[in-house]
Amino acid sequence: MGRGSVTSLAPGFRFHPTDEELVRYYLKRKICNKPFKFDAISVTDVYKSEPWDLPDKSRLKSRDLEWYFFSMLDKKYRNGSKTNRATEMGYWKTTGKDREILNGSKVVGMKKTLVYHKGRAPRGERTNWVMHEYRLVDQDLDKTGVHQDAFVLCRIFQKSGSGPKNGEQYGAPFVEEEWEEEDDMTFVPDQEDLGSEDHVYVHMDDIDQKSENFVVYDAIPIPLNFIHGESSNNVETNYSDSINYIQQTGNYMDSGGYFEQPAESYEKDQKPIIRDRDGSLQNEGIGCGVQDKHSETLQSSDNIFGTDTSCYNDFPVESNYLIGEAFLDPNSNLLENDGLYLETNDLSSTQQDGFDFEDYLTFFDETFDPSQLMGNEDVFFDQEELFQEVETKELEKEETSRSKHVVEEKEKDEASCSKQVDADATEFEPDYKYPLLKKASHMLGAIPAPLANASEFPTKDAAIRLHAAQSSGSVHVTAGMITISDSNMGWSYGKNENLDLILSLGLVQGNTAPEKSGNSSAWAMLIFMCFWVLLLSVSFKVSILVSSR
């Protein structure tokens, strides 16, 4: 058996599917006439060949001791159900019952075990050749009219001896001579060969080499105050010098060691240069609404370059500052060259209109009212509303002062009239003279007074509801009588009067004692009875002992 077939497998690779895979995949696809990804099972008439002749008919070229075949069933009678399994030199005899092949709880096939016997039945000689015959069971195919008995799958192997050989391996033993390296084997190319054929890697020498498309220009000097990140649109750049060296080519330029963009993309990114009537270049405004001495000639009737009220010295002005607050100019705090780092010359330079830190510290003084900043959606306060608020406050003060004078005059009139009234009538003076008495009377009026007659007591049901509404504590507060007399009080009128103050206060013990006393008395009676029973039993015992002697 050679290894020239395309289906030969390397050592360690074996065709060893499970029973379910043989039925659900291989046998079903064969019956439905569908192709296989790996054609490892050949079609032959197993029941017309001897078992020792079948290994040569296998599609898998290996020395394994098991083989797989598709075979058609040969009926013994045309109209019968029995199968003819007789060969020229023997026959295949069924042993045991058919076993079900399950896919979960569903039956997908049947498995039959057969043993080859030499000779004729029933006197044939049993051999070690065994066959497992797999048959498909699919209800869906029955509904479509597919004949499932057209093919069966046979697994044939030879045992090492008589009797059951459970767990026996049927793989071929390894022979090293069969797998020696041959001259016609294909080798994988090395990494060096891959690198020489495919130019995938870039060396450092390739980067140093300059292409012919690169032109070096060293005529443009680099300014002393050059900062990385500055564009050619800076106001301080001399356009008349730099524009003479801009070449209209598609190549890259190297100006002093700095690679720049091509001319096409450079023209797209470059902003237009404004010239006046004399031909001189105009500086480009970086802010909004910049006015220059030469820009007056470019203004039209629409004043397209007019100064915007929302900008101040090329910077947008925040519109949420207060009137009268110091406005800070951003240009006064910036460096001259608009650099992002600090130079030694900047430390020595002094600014005339710099920000005073003391003004910042004294900003939140006592006169500052933060409420003015809240509650108004307008950016600027309306001066007329402020004046109206001041006038309304003054009018309110005048009205309050007038009302005070009217009240004082009224009190004086009432005081003069009270002199002519009897001494008993002084107790019924208005409450606003004595705020303390007014509060005390309200507080004492909320306390319920004790009931005078028995008829005023609530009924039994009302009392139960009243006690249920109260708290479950053992102490309750009821009304009592406390009288304070002969207390002289000095009023603003210079009179000495007697003041009677009545307070109601009292403590009542909760009604928990009867329940406790009732429970304790019951326990006492029970203990007393037990004691007497014990005493009588002891005396009875003693009397029995004495009488026995």
Swiss-Prot record:
Q: Which UniProt keywords apply?
A: Activator, DNA-binding, Endoplasmic reticulum, Membrane, Nucleus, Repressor, Stress response, Transcription, Transcription regulation, Transmembrane, Transmembrane helix
| Top-level taxon in the UniProt lineage | Eukaryota
Q: What induces it?
A: By abscisic acid (ABA). Induced by heat shock. Induced by cold, drought stress and methyl methanesulfonate (MMS) treatment.
Pfam families named among the record's database cross-references: NAM (PF02365)
- Residues the UniProt record assigns to the DNA-binding region sit at 108-165
Tell me how this protein sits in the membrane. Answer: Single-pass membrane protein
Biased composition, Basic and acidic residues: where in the chain?
A: 395-416
The answer on whether this UniProt entry bears the keyword DNA repair reads no
What are the TM regions of this chain, as residue ranges? 526-546
Region called Disordered, residue ranges: 395-418
One cellular component term (GO) for this entry is: cytoplasm
Loss of this gene results in the following: Delayed leaf senescence and enhanced drought resistance. Enhanced heat resistance.
Name the principal localization, coarsely classed: endoplasmic reticulum
Domain NAC as annotated: residue spans: 9-159
Q: In which tissues is it expressed?
A: Expressed in roots, rosette leaves, cauline leaves, shoot apex and stems.
* Cell compartment(s), UniProt: Endoplasmic reticulum membrane; Nucleus
Do you know which Gene3D superfamilies this protein is assigned to?
Answer: NAC domain
Q: What does this protein do?
A: Transcriptional activator activated by proteolytic cleavage through regulated intramembrane proteolysis (RIP). Promotes reactive oxygen species (ROS) production during drought-induced leaf senescence. In response to abscisic acid (ABA)-mediated drought stress signals, binds directly to the promoters of RBOHC and RBOHE genes, encoding ROS biosynthetic enzymes, resulting in ROS accumulation and triggering leaf senescence via programmed cell death (PCD). ROS-induced leaf senescence sustains plant survival under drought conditions. Involved in heat stress response.
**Which PANTHER family does the entry mention?**
NAC DOMAIN-CONTAINING PROTEIN 86-LIKE, PROTEIN CUP-SHAPED COTYLEDON 2-RELATED
Provide the domain comment. Answer: The NAC domain includes a DNA binding domain and a dimerization domain.
Q: What is this protein called?
A: NAC domain-containing protein 53
- What gene codes for this chain? NAC053
